[in-house]
């Protein structure tokens, strides 16, 4: 087998909501160094940290660490697909070449919109959004408790992984939730074998309480 070219770590994590400590990221950077590989830290959910422990991998100051992030999540503009990456200086030229070949460029209106948002958005906006998402997580997991479901307690991002007895996270079961309960989710199987029993719910809608009620009714009748 070929040696790895990169280790990718998403923190805060989708789908688990885990926030990796600075020490864990440093350990991953060491593993990458031993393999002559890059550590790519995907920090797209950096503004959705409920733990207070998130630190950017940029603080490691390593020459084999790349950090990527996106305004699509932090500013709530997912359709714009605007983000950036921070590369070691000796890799910037190669990164630009590959980006040009794959993406060419993002749209100018999207860039202008993000620039305006960066200039005008106060820190209180991110605090308010975090509080809103945290409240949705609390309400949703309370409903999961009521129906006896197992779930992860997210430290960041806006997802909850849940497991329902006798209802694994397959594509077929997620389709059943859509058809019979009117709740859309992602099959855990999409995230690998370790998540096959789980279903991922995204809590970025103001109808979280309604979704929780529908799940309670659906699994209460099973």
Regions found by a protein language model. Give the residues of each.
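A generic structural signal for well-ordered alpha-helical segments
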Residues: 32, 144, 177-178
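Conserved glycine-rich beta-strand-loop-beta hairpin in the small C-terminal domain of fold type I
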Residues: 115, 130-141, 145, 151-164
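PLP-dependent enzyme catalytic core of the Aspartate aminotransferase-like
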Residues: 176-185, 192-222
């Amino acid at each position: 087998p070929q040696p790895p070219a990169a280790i990718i770590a998403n923190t805060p994590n989708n789908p688990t909501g885990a926030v990796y400590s600075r020490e864990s990221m440093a350990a991953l950077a060491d593993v990458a160094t031993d393999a002559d590989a890059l550590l790519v830290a995907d920090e797209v959910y950096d503004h959705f940290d409920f733990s207070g422990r998130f630190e950017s991998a940029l603080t490691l100051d390593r020459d084999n660490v790349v950090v990527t992030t996106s305004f699509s999540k932090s500013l709530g503009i997912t359709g714009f697909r605007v983000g950036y990456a921070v590369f070691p200086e000796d890799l910037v030229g190669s990164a630009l070449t590959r980006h040009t070949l794959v993406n060419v460029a993002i749209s100018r209106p999207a860039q202008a919109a993000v620039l305006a948002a960066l200039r005008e958005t106060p820190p209180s906006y991110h605090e308010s959004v975090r509080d809103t998402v945290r409240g949705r997580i609390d309400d949703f997991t309370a409903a999961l408790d009521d129906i006896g479901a197992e779930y992860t307690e997210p430290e960041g991002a806006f997802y909850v992984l849940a497991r329902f007895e006798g209802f694994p996270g397959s594509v077929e079961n997620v389709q059943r939730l859509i058809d019979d309960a009117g709740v859309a989710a992602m099959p855990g199987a999409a995230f690998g074998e370790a998540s096959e029993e789980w279903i991922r719910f995204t809590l970025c809608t103001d109808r979280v309480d309604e979704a929780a009620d529908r799940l309670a009714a659906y699994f209460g009748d099973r």
